[in-house]
């Protein structure tokens, strides 16, 4: 699918932004003729709970004072459409919501902070968790979103405190023909919104995010693995910035959160784990199959596996559980990949899930049903195992563990236990092969590689890029796990590449500088010190 617009196309009528406005110029943002690097913090404003009234507990003016003192110059300010428009009365706008926004703009202006207004929760639903398909399937939702942005632009066209407008947070468009067609759908909506904004406002920056994933309209499956630069869509506008988010490695930054599939996990940074990005699945070879009717731990293994696809540069251990049933659970433990040379001599045995080593497996389900977690109920060699439960279609838990060297062969082995699995189910261990654009250990080089992908896109397109979100969850700062080192390395990597950034978030139960614990508002003092040491120039 070819997009109808290139990144090189500019607006037919470039405008003079004036000294007080931030605007895009080449690959930079500038203000008053000088380069402007965004150093921002997110304010979440309770958008995920879909509030109908302005949030009171998130922050007050003192938050802007505090951020300025730490060296921040901006806030990515999250919006939920419901503060400004009622579903029962579309296209009529609520002054309560705009009064709240006016108040925050005054607070920001008084403390030397600028705002990026970000539509985090648009009509049709929050995008990031994949529940916002109605934005893409119902044209009226898209029309309402464009109209709301037009109203915002009309009101704030002359407001220099506002840097610009983030059209949709982490879009996950649904294609009309297939998943990849979602790129066209997002491009058309982004252009529709931009055109509506430009009816009233020619001076503020438009922030266009790359897609988080694209969804197939027939199967509902999401393609998460488009090449990085193909995840961006161009718009016709000379004052646009292209936005990406990074939480690499996800298994570290999201550790301990059930909603992210990382419940019960603990990981440190830096580490010598392998993290593959831009991965494309190539093939699998079954190593051995477990019996569905047995509740004992069964040894599962197979013969030597040769990798035949020449594009393979990474291999994974995969625990597959297909069609086990809604009430069934299957477990796997003591999982290994044995590596052999060309003549069949054992080189080494690599642990994937053992008493001493706990791999960061990812879960996938063909129809979205079931779960893949770490269980403390059973274990073959300890009180821990992988657990897949409630899957009615194909599902697996996978760990990309090794870089592939041509000529090497592999054997996968481990133990599996079943509970209530259907007799027709497929429960197996297998070796999967992948091609990855990048394979890095969990170090500063990994973070820098993620940022350099965006830098390369900026050089190729000639447009500015912006890291709209990065952050480490609160569990990353426990027990010497290295959260402060991750944040420091991320900030320095972004600065090294000359890319503006925004930390997620000021007040948030999972990622906040402030969060709630036992009914009390807690500040992450370690994180605050990182900001004081590294945000200011």
Name every feature range the model reports, one short phrase each:
Residues 56-126, 144, 186-203, 207-209, ...:
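Aromatic-lined substrate-binding rim segments of carbohydrate-active enzymes
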Residues 47-54, 81-99, 123-140, 173-179, ...:
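Surface-exposed, active-site-proximal loop segments in enzymatic domains
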Residues 1-6:
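Bacterial N-terminal signal peptides
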Residues 11-74, 421, 441, 445, ...:
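N-terminal carbohydrate-binding accessory modules
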Residues 276-441:
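Extracellular and organelle-lumenal recognition/adhesion modules and their flexible linkers in secreted
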Residues 56, 147-150, 154-157, 161-162, ...:
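Extracellular glycoside hydrolase catalytic/binding regions
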Residues 284-285, 338, 360-370, 374-376, ...:
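Aromatic-rich peripheral "rim/lid" segments of glycoside hydrolase catalytic domains that contact
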Residues 37-43, 73-79, 83, 114-118, ...:
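Structural recognition of the beta-strand scaffold that forms the well-ordered cores
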């Amino acid at each position: 699918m070819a997009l109808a617009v290139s990144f090189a196309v500019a607006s037919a009528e470039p405008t003079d932004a004036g000294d007080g406005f931030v605007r895009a110029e080449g690959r930079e943002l500038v203000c008053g003729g000088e380069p402007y690097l965004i150093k921002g913090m997110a304010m979440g404003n309770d958008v995920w709970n879909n509030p109908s009234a302005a949030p009171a507990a998130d922050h007050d003016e003192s938050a802007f004072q505090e951020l300025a003192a730490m060296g921040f110059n901006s806030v990515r300010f999250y919006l939920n459409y419901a503060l400004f428009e009622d579903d029962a009365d579309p296209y009529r706008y609520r002054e309560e919501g705009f009064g709240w926004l006016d108040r925050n703009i005054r607070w920001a202006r008084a403390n030397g902070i600028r705002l990026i207004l970000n539509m985090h929760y648009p009509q049709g639903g929050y995008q990031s968790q994949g529940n916002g398909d109605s934005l893409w399937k119902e044209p009226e939702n898209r029309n309402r979103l464009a109209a709301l942005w037009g109203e915002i632009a009309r009101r704030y066209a002359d407001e220099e405190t506002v840097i610009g407008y983030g059209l949709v947070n982490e879009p996950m468009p649904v294609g009309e023909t297939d998943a990849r067609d979602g790129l066209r759908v997002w491009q058309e909506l982004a252009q529709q919104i931009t055109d509506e904004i430009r009816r009233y406002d020619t001076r503020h920056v438009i922030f266009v995010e790359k897609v988080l994933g694209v969804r197939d309209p027939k199967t509902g499956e999401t393609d998460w693995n488009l090449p990085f630069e193909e995840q961006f869509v161009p718009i016709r506008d000379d004052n646009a910035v292209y936005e990406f988010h990074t939480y690499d490695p996800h298994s570290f930054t999201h550790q301990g959160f059930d909603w992210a599939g990382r419940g019960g996990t603990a990981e440190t940074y830096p580490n010598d784990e392998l993290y593959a990005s831009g991965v494309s699945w190539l093939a699998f070879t079954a190593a051995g199959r477990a019996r569905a009717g047995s509740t004992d731990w069964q040894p599962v293994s197979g013969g030597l596996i040769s990798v035949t696809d020449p594009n393979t540069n990474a291999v994974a251990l995969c625990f597959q559980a297909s069609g086990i049933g809604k009430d069934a659970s299957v477990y796997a433990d003591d999982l290994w990949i044995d590596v052999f040379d060309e003549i069949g001599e054992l080189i080494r045995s690599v642990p994937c899930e053992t008493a001493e080593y706990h791999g960061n497996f990812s879960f996938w389900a063909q129809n979205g049903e079931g779960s893949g977690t770490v269980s403390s109920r059973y274990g073959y060699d300890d009180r821990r195992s992988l657990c897949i439960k409630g899957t009615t279609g194909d599902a697996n838990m996978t760990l990309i563990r090794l870089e592939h060297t041509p000529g090497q062969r592999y054997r996968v082995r481990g133990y599996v236990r079943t509970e209530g699995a259907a007799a027709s189910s497929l429960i197996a261990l297998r070796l999967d092969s992948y091609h990855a654009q990048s394979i890095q250990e969990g170090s500063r080089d990994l973070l820098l590689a993620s940022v350099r992908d965006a830098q390369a896109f900026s050089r190729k397109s000639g447009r500015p890029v912006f890291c709209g979100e990065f952050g480490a969850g609160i569990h990353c700062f426990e027990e010497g796990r290295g959260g402060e080192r991750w944040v420091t390395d991320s900030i320095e990597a972004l600065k090294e590449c000359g890319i503006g950034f925004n930390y997620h978030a000021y007040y948030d139960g999972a990622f906040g500088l402030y969060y709630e614990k036992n009914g009390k508002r807690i500040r992450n003092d370690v994180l605050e010190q990182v900001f004081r040491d590294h945000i200011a120039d």
